[in-house]
Amino acid sequence: MAVTTSCTGSAPGNGGVAAGKPGTAGVGDRLFPGLGNGGYDVVHYGLTLDYVPETNHLKGTAIITAQATQDLSRFNLDLSGLRLRSTTVQGAKAQVARAGDELLVTPAKTVRNREVFKTVVTYDGTPRTLKDDDGGLEGWMETDDGSTALGQPSGSMTWFPGNHHPSDKATYDTTVTVPKDEDGDPYDVISNGKLITEEDKGKTVTRHWRTEEPMASYLAHVSIGYFETHKGRTDDDVPVYVAIDPDEAEDSADVPDLVPEIVDWASKLFGPYPFSSAGAIVDHLPGLDYALETQTKPYFGEAPEEALLVHELAHQWFGNSVTPREWKDLWLSEGLATYAEWLWEEERGDRGTTEIFEDYYDGTDTESEGIWAFPPADPPGAGRVSDPPVYGRGAMVVHKVRRAVGDETFFDILRTWTRQHRHGNVDTRQFIALCESKSGKDLSALFNTWLFDEKKPSRM
């Protein structure tokens, strides 16, 4: 791998540097070994962006507040493309080298273990769209009236530097300035969390959004374009912000009412809604073959079916608030969100969850194709992490737990899971332990058969 050095400061002196050691490049994720970085935990991202839709040019300043987990002589940040303009650590110029999508940052002085330190990176350029391991598109994508940024699993590094792995969650302030269009009309700028300020400066509009709860970087999001906005509140007084592209308005007419209805319904089953705002973004991005549970406002490239809306909103509990520590445990997000779809269908008086389970087992459900390709908790590679076993068979595991422990214990398990691990990271072992603790049963045979076994289980 070629390494090039950028001119962002003089090499540090010997004093203080030798006492520390470099943080690791990557956090040891089996499926994505290059994602994330060791040696520090990010506390907060302050992102200030200037974007010109007509030229797709982005200029950014990232203020990254982190706490060292060791004495750091050097640490890495993930950034794909974009020109690096300057980097400081604790106000002093840092030396930076680039190795692919890694920034190797050497501060002027060693950062001491447990020290809270601030890194400021300025950058600009044309942000990239990436093709991930399963062939899907992510990163910064142009739309017919602006752009959008989608991050799973690593696309967020195309528009801001950071520690891009779900095990390192942080709060965010995202401020975006966009010039008005040629007719003098403002673009809408939408991001995660609550809208804090909106400023019309004549030729430009600036919006400042804030996430008050920790967020994995793959859930960070910006959409720029023209939207019809709808505001409301849930029964628990959570503010709801729904933005719909005019091209999708007719087919999305029920979305503004469905979002608070689904959030209220899910809160009764899974526990209190975990964030201080809710909503959805329905954009017009033909060719995008997925939706994404971007935190507080799931993103859809077209008008969503009701079941898909349920799925992405359920992720606010399972995946966004309670986040897998490694990508191999993604079934904890996707299996539970898929099961939420089943519960919603049951609530609506259509198929019951047992009937859906049987349809999946028999292969008669349209979503059941390929679910026996591998165990849900053991995807064979990065390109398979979003395959049907993680979703459909993952939901079947959840249903088998429900049948084994009974409804009262099952929903107690779900509410305890979201309460105990609120805004944290989890793994499969913890979920199994909770199921066994709450039920008082040895469930090893169930999990070995349905979650870990390579073969399609016999009908039981």
Feature locations, PLM:
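N-terminal, polar/Ser/Thr-rich
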Residues: 3-59, 142-145, 166
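Beta-strand-rich interaction surfaces with strong enrichment in secreted/lumenal proteins
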Residues: 48-49, 93-94, 106-111, 159-164, ...
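Hydrophobic helix-coil surface modules that form long, contiguous segments used
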Residues: 60, 165-310, 339
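Surface-exposed beta-strand/loop patches in extracellular or lumenal glycoproteins
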Residues: 61-82, 160-164, 171-179, 429
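A surface-exposed beta-strand-loop module
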Residues: 79-141
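Glycine/proline-rich low-complexity spacer/linker segments in large multi-domain proteins
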Residues: 113, 123-172
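Zinc-dependent metallopeptidase catalytic helix centered on the HExxH motif
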Residues: 295-359
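Amphipathic alpha-helical substructures
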Residues: 352, 387-460
